[in-house]
Amino acid sequence: MELLPREKDKLLVFTAALLAERRLNRGLKLNYPEAMAFITMEIIEGARDGKTVAELMAYGKTLLSAEQVMDGVVELIHEVQVEATFPDGTKLVTVHNPIN
């Protein structure tokens, strides 16, 4: 199977997000890459489910709390930008201050 670089990147993010989800379920705090991957995957999957850009921008702020990430991660993530595929095309979703 041949995958484009963009498709490989999406699979890598998805794999990291699954690991992050498992760690969250075990009560572990996420590090920076895990938190970014988790938020990114949820936005991509939300777009696939038919949510709007505005809905995903709001949803992205509800995914993680400061208690769910390691010290310093909140200060590192000021915004998350994701190119997601919607039913009407690819759009950029930006979530400002995603971890409360």
Swiss-Prot record:
Subcellular location as annotated: Cytoplasm
Broad class of the protein's primary localization: cytoplasm
Alphabetical UniProt keywords: Cytoplasm, Hydrolase
InterPro entries associated with the record: Urease_gamma, Urease_gamma/gamma-beta_su, Urease_gamma_sf, Urease_subunit
EC identifiers of the protein: 3.5.1.5
Gene Ontology biological process terms from the UniProt entry: urea catabolic process
Coiled coil: none
CDD domains recorded: Urease_gamma
Reaction(s) this enzyme catalyzes, per UniProt: urea + 2 H2O + H(+) = hydrogencarbonate + 2 NH4(+)
Pathway where this protein functions: Nitrogen metabolism; urea degradation; CO(2) and NH(3) from urea (urease route): step 1/1
GO cellular component terms attached to this protein's record: cytoplasm
EC primary class: hydrolase
GO MF terms held by the record: nickel cation binding; urease activity
HAMAP family for this protein: Urease_gamma
Family per record: Belongs to the urease gamma subunit family.
Quaternary context: Heterotrimer of UreA (gamma), UreB (beta) and UreC (alpha) subunits. Three heterotrimers associate to form the active enzyme.
Name the record gives this protein: Urease subunit gamma
Organism from which the protein derives: Marinomonas sp. (strain MWYL1)
